[in-house]
């Protein structure tokens, strides 16, 4: 009936898993522990998912092959609400000069690998500056 993924619940209290209402899907509970976000997500800039993992995705999750665990590298049904890119992105920027600054700022990858909101194809000098 209600969500088992709030701050006062745990996966154990849900019998090892839970079902959330269709109108509410907690992005921190919609993926296996191996795919938790470990880098900043846009808008909220939450660095790490701390709530219990109590609902696996219905469809297979596409983890980031670069181990960046970007918030958009999973099916649309499992994307955080702040994500705008909804496709799994291959690690085609692995040999370029720098890492993405954030989920929506993959500044150092070929144009063919950039999500729609990004237009920059070269790295900026300062790592603290947004790229896209």
Swiss-Prot record:
Q: Iron as a keyword? A: no
Keyword Lipid metabolism listed: no
Query: What are the annotated GO cellular component locations?
Result: cytosol; keratin filament
Matching Pfam families, A to Z? Answer: Keratin_B2 (PF01500)
Spell out the disulfide connections.
none
On the tree of life, the source organism's domain of life is Eukaryota
Give the transmembrane ranges: none
| This protein's UniProt keywords | Keratin
Q: Which InterPro entries match?
A: KAP, KRTAP_type_2-like
Functional note: The keratin products of mammalian epidermal derivatives such as wool and hair consist of microfibrils embedded in a rigid matrix of other proteins. The matrix proteins include the high-sulfur and high-tyrosine keratins, having molecular weights of 6-20 kDa, whereas the microfibrils contain the larger, low-sulfur keratins (40-56 kDa).
Under the heading PANTHER family, the entry gives: KERATIN-ASSOCIATED PROTEIN 2-1
This protein is called Keratin, high-sulfur matrix protein, IIIA3
Q: Which organism is it from?
A: Capra hircus (Goat)
């Amino acid at each position: 009936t209600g969500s088992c993924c709030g701050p006062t619940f745990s996966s154990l209290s849900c019998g090892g898993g839970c079902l959330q209402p269709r109108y509410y899907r907690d992005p921190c509970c919609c993926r296996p522990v191996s795919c938790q976000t470990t880098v900043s997500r846009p808008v909220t800039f939450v660095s790490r998912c701390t709530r219990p993992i109590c609902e696996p995705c219905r469809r297979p999750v596409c983890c980031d092959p670069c181990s960046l665990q970007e918030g958009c590298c999973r099916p649309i049904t499992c994307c955080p609400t702040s994500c705008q890119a909804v496709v799994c992105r291959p690690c085609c920027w692995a040999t370029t000069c720098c890492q993405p600054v954030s989920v929506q700022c993959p500044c150092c990858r070929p144009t063919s690998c950039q999500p729609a909101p990004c237009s920059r194809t070269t790295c900026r000098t300062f790592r603290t500056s947004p790229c896209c």
